[in-house]
Regions:
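Secretory targeting signatures
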Residues: 1-22
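Conserved functional loop/turn residues at catalytic and ligand-binding sites
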Residues: 9, 287, 327
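Catalytic cores of phosphodiester-bond hydrolases, prominently lipid phosphodiesterases
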Residues: 22-321
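Single conserved hydrophobic/aromatic residue that forms the stacking wall/gate
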Residues: 323-329
Length: 329
């Protein structure tokens, strides 16, 4: 079964526009901002299924990043980053699940940037970066790296391989407000039309990893990445709640308040194996902005995959005004 979504506003405020622009019979009553769209995302966006998989959750393969963007409408990507003594920042899941469509962080960024610059009117993308700090076993050598050094290297490569003028940073959103959180709750996110062709980077880490990053960039001043910060903190702007069924009410409240929220439509193979879209439907109903999946397109022999509504990569969400009416057709 393919799930298609049509968002129908309860109050006629906007037309639903694709990436070519917003249209409708009525004039806009409020400018569209970054948190007024929903986008399809992929989990472990670089992933290639291993030849011999030790577990069901590794049994999926993604198209290359630019193909996901061009053909599947994916606008949110997740990249795991490891430090390697030979190759610097490498991209793979773990040592038992190392297949990847872009072997290094640089290659991943360059692949997405090339597509972005060739399609410079696309809705803004989000790139979630998860640093991995487990020791790597290679050639009988155990390599470790200080977490702060890993974060600095990630920040450095973002600055080197992605143009600053095509990046939406915490400083851009904060503006003249004392904190990022105040800016999000008061002025809101940047306008959608001013954000086309740009990207938001998010550090997918909590605990010590996040705290080390905030030590380097207090209040995220000067930072290139947003963080998953606690509600009420000065850095709070973006949240990841991966269970849209159990966390649906919290997701909906965060969305209503003006935060950007990521969730997941499937995890570990249970949903695709049972052609179960309940989790996906819950994510849509809660108004989550990015909905991540292992199956953004058709897979031979499987009925389950997550379809973008009407082929539009980022449908307008009405959750900032009222919850959408969701029709599954």
């Amino acid at each position: 079964m393919v799930v298609m979504l049509v968002l129908v506003p309860l109050s006629g405020c906007f037309g639903i526009g694709g990436e070519g622009g917003i249209f409708g019979d009525e004039p806009e009553k409020e400018p569209l901002r970054l948190n007024h769209i929903q986008m399809e995302g992929t989990h472990n966006s670089y992933h290639v299924e291993p030849i011999f998989s030790p577990t069901r959750e590794y049994m999926y393969t993604h198209e290359p990043l630019d193909v996901q963007a061009a053909q599947l409408g994916v606008r949110q990507f997740e990249i795991d980053v490891w430090w390697d003594v030979r190759d610097g920042l490498r991209v793979y899941h773990n040592q038992y699940d190392s297949g990847t469509t872009c072997a290094t962080f640089q290659i991943c960024l360059e692949t997405l940037l090339a597509w972005s610059q060739a399609n410079d009117q696309h809705h803004p993308m989000m790139i979630w970066i998860e640093p991995k700090d487990w020791p790597e076993q290679a050639a009988d050598i155990t390599t470790t790296v200080e977490l702060s050094g890993l974060l600095q290297e990630i920040e450095s490569e973002i600055a080197e391989f992605w143009p600053r003028n095509l990046t939406i940073t915490p400083d851009d959103v904060r503006g003249e407000w004392p904190t990022l959180n105040e800016a999000v709750l008061t002025d809101g996110w940047p306008l959608l039309e001013e954000s086309r062709g740009k990207v938001i980077f998010v550090l997918l880490a909590r605990g010590d990893m996040r705290d080390l990053y905030l030590e380097d960039y207090p209040g995220l001043n000067g930072a290139l990445m947003f963080t998953l910060s606690d509600l009420g903190s000065g850095e709070a702007a973006i949240f990841s709640l991966t269970d849209p069924i159990g966390d649906g009410e919290q997701i909906a409240q965060l969305v209503t308040d003006g935060y950007i929220v990521r969730t997941r439509a499937d995890s570990g193979g249970e949903e695709p194996d049972n052609n179960d879209t309940v989790r996906f439907e819950a994510a849509l109903a809660a108004g989550a902005h990015t909905i991540s999946t292992d199956y953004p397109g058709p897979v031979e022999g499987m009925d389950y995959w997550i379809a973008v509504p009407n082929g539009t990569p980022s449908p307008v969400s009405y959750t900032h005004l009222t919850l959408p009416t969701i029709l599954l057709v």
